[in-house]
Amino acid sequence: YALLNIGVIFVLSIFVSLFLNSIRRAMIFMNIFYFCMSLVFYYVYLFRGEAFQLIDLYSIATAADVVGGYKFEITGEIVTSFITMMLVVRLWLQSREYRFARKTRNKILLRVAAAALMLGTYLAYMNLNWNAEFGVISDLWNPAKTYRQYGTTVGFTAVAKYMRLTPPDGLSLIHISEPTRPY
């Protein structure tokens, strides 16, 4: 499953590279993004005892209200990760810049193609049974178990696939308000 985790990160890196029109900027962004996400995953698990899930973004306002009550301690691992991330970013800053497109028209076409590719990937992600094909079984009652078994990236995407907020079939506002009309 390590290769599958790396594959997901690689695909995300390609999308970011196409949108930013630069491998160097994309790699800098991805390094900072993954460091920040590792902090989110760490602190959510530390404070709540449960893994961070995509659905948690819906309750971000509540999290912002209660975050002041927690004590954030910076561990040696966090410091080491931060220093490593900054060294990698520094290496990327010294690397040669490579752009996929130089003219404005080509940049726009590149981003439209990247958006179409992302849409196609999202539709495949949601509608194909990719997780069963790779043997990934999502434990929706205990996402942390899924993360531990298959890796954080694959576990997060597998659990997020089933965490969509969709209304039940046949349910509408009219059906809900009908039983309450006589009262």
Residue positions per predicted region:
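Cytoplasm-facing regions of membrane-associated proteins and arrestin-like adaptors
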Residues: G135-G170
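Charged, low-complexity, helix-prone segments enriched in Lys/Glu/Asp/Gln
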Residues: Q94-R99, F156-R164, S177
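Transmembrane and membrane-interface helices of multi-pass
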Residues: Y1-Y147
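Intrinsic-disorder/low-complexity, polar/charged segments
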Residues: S22, L171-L173
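Single conserved hydrophobic/aromatic residue that forms the stacking wall/gate
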Residues: I174-Y183
